């Protein structure tokens, strides 16, 4: 769906995409928004499909609805029988039934293309610039890396989109996050997105759609851009966007569901208008110098609890207001003492994967650090590719052998340890260096302690047995 994106006053990228999809706008600003792509997984969709049945409705656009099981899916070879939780087993079975009954584009566990929905969508070419994309999952913002307006929705909204291919929504405000200059060696897209959250807080983006821009963002690959946008929700934003460019077009071109021939040329012509105009209004602007960003890790139980690896665990007294008690609770849960150097915190496990960092470039980066090394004694490691195709490509490149030789488990695709909904979990008190997106209490299993970081930082921690500055290992290889 397109629209006149050049008329009137200067507009942001978000303005252009939103305006092009408005079906109807009420006087109070409430809009009916057309949805181009609807992604569904097994956790937030069963009630929505049952609602359709009870109302005697069909899915309005099954051809634009993509279904993938990922949250409950075991990453061991015994896929279906490995689902120990009865509710999880039912959810996966219901998605299978619903996808087949309603004629959706479906990637079951037996399909090599199956994986985490936010990796499968772009991989298959379902995600395109200028689109509206929704899913009953908070990390739908990942797709914003393509210049698509993408965000999570609730189960009742899932039913509404299934039935009407529209969503009722008011427009958010515009926020610009500019990362100027170049990143230093050892600093990655994950460090960018965590540093932004550390600077603005988890409520800094509330009520906004963020556009990420600046030289450091432009320098990122598409996979790096997906990592940045993935965590827009952790910064409180409805969505995160990056304007499409030649890197975007090159990534999309030739994928199974990308336009072909004349349709490609027409689509690309529109995509090239998808940028924020000079003089467009921003309600909030945050600027960070790329050269000031260091490899970072989280120390507490919120993504905003982030510091450079060269720092020390803060004390509750370092904070103000309600954050004093929050810090005290975080330190108690994480079993940390104020003043402890972050690079002395010992770990029990390493998790490399998730919709944040489960793509081929993430695995290459981690393998580059691990090659010729072993996991430290007493540390277990798990590498979970984000899709079956990522896994296959990694094996073609020999990355699996590097991980296995280092002592990691090489798993099948799925959400895995990122959330405690499948067999891959931490034991109470276990501490994990993780490439996922949330470090909440119990996120990776009851009592589990999560430190968020980049794939290269997680790999370095695995080698040393404690949180480590990856730049030290990089210096050793020079």
UniProtKB/Swiss-Prot annotation:
A GO biological process held by the record: L-leucine biosynthetic process
Swiss-Prot/TrEMBL cofactor(s): [4Fe-4S] cluster
Principal EC category: lyase
EC number: 4.2.1.33
Reactions catalysed, as given in the entry: (2R,3S)-3-isopropylmalate = (2S)-2-isopropylmalate
Molecular function in Gene Ontology: 3-isopropylmalate dehydratase activity; 4 iron, 4 sulfur cluster binding; metal ion binding
Entry binding sites for [4Fe-4S] cluster: 355, 415, 418
Record-annotated disulphide pairs: none
Known pathway: Amino-acid biosynthesis; L-leucine biosynthesis; L-leucine from 3-methyl-2-oxobutanoate: step 2/4
Subunit structure: Heterodimer of LeuC and LeuD.
HAMAP family assigned: LeuC_type1
Protein name (database record): 3-isopropylmalate dehydratase large subunit
Species of origin: Paracoccus denitrificans (strain Pd 1222)
Gene name for this UniProt entry: leuC
């Amino acid at each position: 769906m397109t629209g006149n994106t050049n008329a009137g006053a200067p507009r942001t990228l978000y303005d252009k995409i939103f305006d092009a999809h408005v079906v109807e706008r009420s006087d109070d600003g409430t809009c009916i928004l057309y949805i181009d792509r609807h992604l569904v997984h097994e956790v937030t969709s069963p009630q929505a499909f049952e609602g359709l049945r009870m109302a005697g409705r069909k899915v309005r656009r099954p051809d634009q609805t993509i279904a993938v099981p990922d949250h409950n899916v075991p990453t061991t070879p015994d896929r279906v029988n490995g689902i120990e939780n009865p509710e999880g087993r039912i959810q996966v079975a219901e998605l299978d039934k619903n996808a087949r009954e309603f004629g959706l584009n479906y990637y079951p566990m037996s399909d090599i293309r199956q994986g985490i929905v936010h990796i499968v969508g772009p991989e298959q070419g379902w995600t395109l610039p200028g689109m509206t994309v929704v899913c009953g999952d908070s990390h739908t913002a990942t797709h914003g890396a393509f210049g698509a307006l993408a965000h999570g929705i609730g189960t009742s909204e899932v039913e509404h989109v299934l039935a009407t291919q529209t969503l009722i929504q008011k427009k958010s405000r515009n926020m610009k996050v500019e990362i100027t200059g170049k990143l230093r060696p050892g600093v990655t897209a994950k460090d960018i997105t965590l540093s932004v959250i550390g600077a603005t807080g988890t409520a800094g983006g509330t009520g906004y759609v963020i556009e990420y821009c600046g030289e450091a963002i432009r320098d990122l690959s598409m996979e790096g851009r997906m990592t940045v946008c993935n965590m827009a929700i952790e910064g409180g934003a409805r969505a995160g966007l990056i304007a499409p460019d030649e890197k975007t077009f090159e990534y999309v071109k030739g994928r199974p569901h990308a336009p072909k021939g004349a349709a490609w040329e027409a689509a690309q012509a529109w995509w090239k208008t998808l940028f924020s105009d000079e003089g467009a209004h921003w309600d909030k602007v945050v600027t960070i110098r790329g050269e000031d960003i260091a490899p970072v890790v989280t120390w507490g139980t919120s993504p905003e609890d982030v510091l450079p690896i060269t720092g020390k665990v803060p004390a509750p007294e370092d904070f103000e207001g309600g954050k004093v008690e929050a810090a005290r609770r975080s330190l108690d849960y994480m079993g940390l003492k104020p003043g402890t150097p972050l690079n002395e915190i010992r770990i029990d496990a390493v998790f490399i994967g998730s919709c944040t960092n489960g793509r081929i470039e993430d695995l290459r980066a981690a393998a580059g650090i691990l090659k010729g090394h072993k996991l430290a004694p007493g540390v277990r490691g798990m590498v979970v590719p984000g899709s079956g195709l990522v896994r296959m490509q990694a094996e073609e490149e020999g990355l699996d052998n590097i991980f296995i030789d280092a002592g990691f488990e090489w798993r099948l695709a799925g959400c895995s340890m990122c959330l405690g909904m499948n067999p891959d979990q931490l034991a109470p008190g276990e501490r994990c260096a993780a490439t996922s997106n949330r470090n909440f209490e119990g996120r990776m299993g009851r009592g589990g302690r999560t430190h968020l970081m980049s794939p290269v930082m997680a790999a370095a921690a695995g080698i040393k047995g404690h949180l480590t500055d990856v730049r030290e290992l990089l210096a050793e290889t020079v």
